[in-house]
């Protein structure tokens, strides 16, 4: 790239201390390789191994830190304090996007469709939760990404074990009504939606979980996505509203479902999506704007 020097010295922030460290290392390596190949003066920077004060002297930061500490507004706040420009969503939008409950509250307040949910614990009246939300349920740690700690629950007697699994990763756990249908993901670049991708996990996994996202080679990514042109445009517009509602900007991803009646439901926002070879967004297939 002829004007790569305009970016100056770029820190590719990767790794970190979250449960998604290994994914971040893989994503960061892919981003670093693509930047260097494009002629950018880029270096890997792992906040687990180095003090963030060592970022002084870098001109920009490309954030590829997944999960807590990197996707929740913390590193964004440090970079703003150091006056270093960075990629993606700012402090507030990152903090909201990392919190599944706050994200859903904002979407609900904006009249955007998202599945009913409850915050739960082992002390909750689990029979009441099942009566209210029905079965199946999806149990999620509120502040984790990459499907870490998530479980699909089809029988009420399995709910306590799923909560215990989720609480290994987060003190706050939610139960969400399971949406049966087709899953889609919509990436954003420069704040605008890209073509919709249909996700088709293998038949032997319950949902698009951590293993399917990063360890399996038999997940199908459908482009075209199988929606009509009108439906795809409707989903893109819906996800753009959802992306903007939480204060996300730059690049990111929204995951959504279409139920058996054809209705769309918003699942989650990802302000720093995975960029590994297994991810629905691979940095090596993107080009830097000139």
Label the predicted regions.
Residues 1-102, 109, 121-128:
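ATP-binding N-terminal substructure of ATP-dependent carboxylate-amine bond-forming enzymes
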Residues 1-14, 42, 52-53, 96-182:
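Active-site nucleotide/adenylate-binding loops and adjacent lid/helix of ATP-dependent enzymes
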Residues 154-237, 258-265:
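Phosphate-binding site of ATP-dependent enzymes
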Residues 177, 188, 243-275, 285:
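Conserved metal-phosphate-binding beta-hairpin within the catalytic cores
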Residues 207-208, 276-283:
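A short, polar/charged loop-to-alpha-helix boundary motif
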Residues 284-290:
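Conserved small/polar residues in nucleotide/adenosyl-binding loops
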């Amino acid at each position: 790239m002829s004007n790569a020097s305009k970016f100056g010295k770029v820190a590719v922030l990767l790794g970190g201390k979250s449960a998604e460290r290994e994914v971040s290392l893989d994503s960061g390596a892919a981003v670093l390789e693509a930047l260097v190949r494009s002629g950018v003066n880029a270096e890997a920077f792992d906040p687990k191994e180095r003090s963030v004060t060592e970022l002084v002297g870098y001109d920009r930061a490309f954030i590829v830190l997944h999960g807590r500490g990197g996707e929740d507004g913390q590193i964004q706040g440090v970079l703003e304090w150091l006056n270093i420009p960075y990629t993606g969503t700012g402090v507030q939008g990152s903090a909201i996007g990392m919190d599944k409950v706050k994200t859903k509250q904002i979407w609900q307040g904006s009249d955007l469709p998202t599945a009913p949910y409850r915050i739960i614990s082992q002390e909750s009246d689990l029979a009441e939760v099942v009566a209210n939300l029905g079965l199946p349920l999806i149990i999620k740690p509120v502040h984790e990404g990459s499907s870490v700690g998530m479980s699909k629950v089809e029988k009420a007697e399995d709910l306590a074990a799923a909560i215990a699994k989720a609480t290994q990763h987060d003190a706050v756990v939610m139960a969400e009504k399971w949406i049966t249908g087709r899953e889609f993901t919509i990436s954003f670049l420069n704040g605008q939606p890209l073509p919709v991708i249909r996700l088709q996990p293998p038949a032997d996994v319950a949902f698009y979980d951590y293993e399917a996202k990063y360890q399996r080679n038999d997940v199908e990514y459908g482009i075209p996505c199988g929606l009509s042109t009108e439906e795809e445009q409707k989903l893109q517009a819906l996800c753009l509203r959802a992306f903007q509602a939480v204060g996300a900007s730059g690049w990111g991803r929204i995951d959504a479902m279409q139920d058996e009646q054809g209705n769309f439901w918003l699942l989650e926002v990802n302000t720093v999506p995975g960029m590994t070879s297994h991810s629905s967004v691979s940095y090596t297939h993107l080009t830097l704007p000139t």
